UniProtKB/Swiss-Prot annotation:
InterPro entries: Asp/Glu-ADT_sf_sub_c (IPR036113), GatC (IPR003837). It comes from Nitrosococcus oceani (strain ATCC 19707 / BCRC 17464 / JCM 30415 / NCIMB 11848 / C-107). It is an enzyme of class 6 (ligase). Heterotrimer of A, B and C subunits. This is Aspartyl/glutamyl-tRNA(Asn/Gln) amidotransferase subunit C.
Length: 95
């Protein structure tokens, strides 16, 4: 599919991009090649192909769900500059 100059300008407008008029032929060429490639991919017969969640057929190696650290809430509360009712107080940032 070959794009026209007006197509590139419209795409740039939709994307809120400012493109120099001198660069439009370059973008026209590149975008046309991308669309041709997408067209080639659309022609591939995927009738008996099972959809995949991930392109790599790998299994995630997850660690066992075990507690690895103890609760240090009291320790962190004791060293905080200001605490009230169990929450950390910070200086006012916005008026």
């Amino acid at each position: 599919m070959t794009l026209k100059t007006a197509d590139v300008e419209y795409i740039a407008h939709l994307a809120r991009l400012a493109i120099d008029s001198e660069a439009i032929p370059h973008y026209k060429h590149d975008l046309s090649r991308i669309l041709e490639f997408v067209g080639q991919m659309n022609k591939v017969d995927t009738t008996n192909i099972e959809p995949m969640a991930h392109p790599l057929d790998a299994i995630q190696r997850l660690r066992p769900d075990e507690v690895t650290e103890s609760d240090q809430w009291r320790t962190f509360q004791s060293i905080a500059p200001q605490v009230e009712a169990g929450v950390y107080l910070i200086p006012k940032v916005i008026d």
